[in-house]
Amino acid sequence: MMSYIKQPHYAVNGLTLAGTGMDLLHSAVGYPTTPRKQRRERTTFTRAQLDILEALFAKTRYPDIFMREEVALKINLPESRVQVWFKNRRAKCRQQQQQSTGQAKPRPAKKKTSPARETNSEASTNGQYSPPPPGTAVTPSSTASATVSIWSPASISPIPDPLSAATTPCMQRSAGYPMTYSQAPAYTQSYGGSSSYFTGLDCGSYLSPMHPQLSAPGATLSPIATPTMGSHLSQSPASLSAQGYGASSLGFTSVDCLDYKDQTASWKLNFNATDCLDYKDQSSWKFQVL
């Protein structure tokens, strides 16, 4: 087992991957020994060579291949050096022309750039805050006054107070709405007066708006339309004999449903006979917190 582990490296094309094999592999590959030339040697021209080149440059700035070869033979230099000299000479000539034009016309160049700056400055000043005319300055105040007038109490029609509306006679419907639109105990409290309260009164118009509010699911209780209450209550569409209170809505059973006229009985509506005072006496009103 140990001999299997200590076996030499596998051979790749007859060469192991050990250090000697890698050396043989590298030695088989040929690398260039001479380094690459980084830059050309700088050519120095003599005065005679420069005179010949300048004479040709005065004739033409772009000599063809034949002219360059002829000049190269005269000055004893390769044609590529002559081509590079003409290239550099044209660049030097363009630079001299730009410098001469820049020195001759410095002010027009500045004038060309100054209008752009002036326009930018004008645009920046225009972008700043400019005082609006007096007519537009009143706009925020007018809008503020409009909003104030919207929320001012004078512009809103006063909402009728339920308590003040209750001072009107009981025949008007506005007096009965704040009391009878509440839950069932409040409704019975509004009718909790003695039976003589309904005598001689036409309560048909008073109870007719309560027709949809008095309907409740559940078994109906004993009718409260008594002879002392008059025929108007029994014949009104809101007669409680047809609608009735649900046993589940008021939280008491049929055993607790005593006679409506019997005020001395133990009513389960959290008030006694002393609380059922005259409807018009506002000082004796007692509202139950629901």
From Swiss-Prot:
| Molecular function in Gene Ontology | DNA binding; DNA-binding transcription factor activity, RNA polymerase II-specific
Q: Which domain of life is it from?
A: Eukaryota
Q: Which cysteines are joined by disulfide bonds?
A: none
Chief subcellular location equals nucleus
Keywords, ordered alphabetically: Developmental protein, Differentiation, DNA-binding, Homeobox, Nucleus, Transcription, Transcription regulation
Function of the molecule:
Transcription factor involved in anterior and eye development. Promotes the differentiation of both rod and cone photoreceptors cells in the retina. Together with other retinal homeobox proteins, acts as an effector of a cellular clock which, depending on cell cycle progression, establishes the generation of distinct retinal neuronal cell types. Acts synergistically with nrl to activate the rhodopsin promoter. Promotes the formation of anterior regions and represses the formation of posterior structures during development.
Protein name (record): Homeobox protein otx5
- Which species? Xenopus tropicalis
